[in-house]
Amino acid sequence: MDLLLINGPNLNLVGKREPSIYGSQTLEDIQAELLTLASELDAKLKFFQSNSEGEMIDCIQKSVGSIDGILINAGAYTHTSIALRDALLGVAIPYVEVHLSNIYSREEFRHKSFLSDKALGLVCGFGANSYQLALEGIVSYLKRV
């Protein structure tokens, strides 16, 4: 099973940016833990991070035929990007939306997600563990279908 984790804008700063909200682990630390978990779950996990909406869309489109499931933390694009939504729907690859913080306990403008209503699921608010929970969820789903 081949999976892709896409991280959007400013997630390259995790561990440095607002640690009281996003935690102190770096994206590299989180990814290292996820690789271990993916191996335990008999899954392969690739990573992509970009601050550019267009690059994220290109990555999604290029994953057709090689990726079975997507984990996506679109960062601020979660709340603004119909284009990301359309790309995810266009490739018809199952995806799980993931966020480090609970987007529904933050500013009101963060309460709207253009991705969650079509996602397999949404995991948010558990810090770095949100990624692990999302990974376990999508692997469980893909093993059943």
From Swiss-Prot:
Active-site residues, record numbering mapped to chain: 22 (proton acceptor), 99 (proton donor)
MF-aspect GO terms: 3-dehydroquinate dehydratase activity
Entry EC number(s): 4.2.1.10
Keyword field contains Lyase: yes
Pathway of action: Metabolic intermediate biosynthesis; chorismate biosynthesis; chorismate from D-erythrose 4-phosphate and phosphoenolpyruvate: step 3/7
Pfam family, one: DHquinase_II
Any one GO BP annotation for this protein: amino acid biosynthetic process
Database matches in CDD domains: DHQase_II (cd00466)
Annotated function: Catalyzes a trans-dehydration via an enolate intermediate.
NCBIfam families attached to this UniProt entry: aroQ, PRK05395.1-1, PRK05395.1-2, PRK05395.1-3, PRK05395.1-4
The protein's assembly and partners: Homododecamer.
Name of the protein in question: 3-dehydroquinate dehydratase
Native species: Prochlorococcus marinus (strain NATL2A)
Source species taxonomy: Bacteria, Bacillati, Cyanobacteriota, Cyanophyceae, Synechococcales
